[in-house]
């Protein structure tokens, strides 16, 4: 099964999206957006940029946990991964976003 996007609304009324792999695991999380349309535009940007390896910023957090950001052509962060136990695990996460990021399936959980 291929992955999908979910749009949800935070308690403060802002919107975010996540990209889930086919197994239901969250592999990318967006920032918070004031408008639902902005979250939808963020999804479109992931769909466009996720297959380009140059768009991934491979990082290590202060707690020494590897993670990554997916950036648009304008260098703005579109989404951020979880923290991983190793760089190898992070790189598998990037491959998962590449494989699932182009999906057109969007589940709107905002009601």
UniProtKB/Swiss-Prot annotation:
Residues 89-111 are annotated as: Disordered. Coiled coil: none annotated. Gene3D superfamilies: 2.30.29.80. Sequence repeats lie at residues 10-58, 61-109. It comes from the Bacteria. InterPro entries: DUF1508 (IPR010879), UPF0339_domain (IPR051141), YegP-like_sf (IPR036913). Keywords: Repeat. Belongs to the UPF0339 family. Duplicated subfamily. PANTHER family: PTHR40606, UPF0339 PROTEIN YEGP. This is UPF0339 protein ACIAD0721. It comes from Acinetobacter baylyi (strain ATCC 33305 / BD413 / ADP1). The lineage of its organism: Bacteria, Pseudomonadati, Pseudomonadota, Gammaproteobacteria, Moraxellales.
């Amino acid at each position: 099964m291929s992955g999908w996007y979910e749009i949800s609304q935070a308690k403060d009324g802002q919107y975010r999206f996540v990209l889930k792999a086919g197994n239901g695991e969250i592999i990318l999380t967006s920032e918070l957006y004031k408008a639902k349309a902005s979250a939808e535009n963020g999804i479109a940007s992931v769909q466009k940029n996720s297959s380009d390896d140059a768009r991934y910023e491979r990082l290590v957090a202060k707690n020494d946990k590897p993670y990554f950001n997916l950036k648009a052509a304008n260098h703005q962060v579109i989404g951020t991964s979880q923290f991983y136990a190793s760089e190898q695990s992070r790189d598998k996460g990037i491959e998962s976003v590449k494989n699932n990021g182009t999906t057109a399936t969007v589940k709107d959980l905002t009601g």
